[in-house]
Amino acid sequence: MPPSGDVAVVIPARNESDRIEATVSGAAELPGVDLVIVVDDGSADDTAERAGRAGATVLRHGRNRGKAAAMETGAEAVRLLEATDAPPGAHRARHLLFLDADLGETAGAAGPLTEPVRAGEADMTIAVFTERVRQGGHGLVVGLSGAGIERATGWRPAQPLNGQRCLTRAAFETARPLAAGFGVETALTIDLLRAGMRVTEVEVPLGHRATGNDWASQRHRARQFADVARALAVREPATRGLVAGRSGRGPARIRPGRS
């Protein structure tokens, strides 16, 4: 049985004051979680204050530095807290569960993501939402990421841009430095598979805010596209079958989550 208190949740957040409290509360109730960190990435609202009221440990970027930077900040904070709080000779690295800030109360259903990692069956899990949210224009970026991952590894994930992921500390350190901005998920998948690590997709009943078709949403997708393209540009050309050749096995198929 996995030990209790072996998972830290890291939530990058920017201007999510309307959902962050519910997200933190849901995450804090997950099995194995004893630490929830919110990294406020230059919010203009009271995201940080609300996260703190909900019980999270809050870190703040003075300006918007991007999702990957927020993930690194949160993971480093976990490491420092572990080094400070653990008695001599008892340090044990927590697994890292990354969740989006806009999950709201559905964050409490993320438990199945941690199970393969806590059981030693996977080095990273990727969420597959059982109920897809329609997002205008988002398919172009998903297609770019999925095709790039497939070219690099011979495997195409169902939801390559899904940011809900659980990693061992060793897997996270293997992937550092993280690719910038919104290219982080694409790069994580490629880099860990190339390193011979085990990646599993897990179905979970999570949901978040849909991206619209207004000007701000279109700019957001343009930034996503550019970040994913940059992450892929430095990881090609790649040989199909590289993963199987180095690790002896390919990624696992989608694993149904257990409630």
Q: What is the meaning of each model-derived region?
A:
Residues V39, H61, L99-A101:
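Catalytic metal- and UDP-sugar-binding loop of GT-A-like glycosyltransferases, i.e.
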Residues E16-R19, S43, T106:
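Donor nucleotide-sugar binding loop of glycosyltransferases
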Residues M1-P3, P177-A179, G183-S259:
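Hydrophobic helical membrane-anchoring modules
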Residues N15-E29:
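Short, well-formed alpha-helical segments that are part of the catalytic scaffolds
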Residues I11, G32-G42, L59:
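Short beta-strand/loop segment that forms part of the nucleotide-sugar
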Residues D40-A48, L103:
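A conserved acidic beta->alpha catalytic loop
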Residues G62-A77, H91-A93, T106-L178, F182, ...:
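Acceptor/aglycone-binding surface of glycosyltransferases and processive sugar-polymer synthases
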Residues T84-G104:
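Short beta-strand-to-loop acidic/aromatic patch adjacent to the donor-nucleotide binding site
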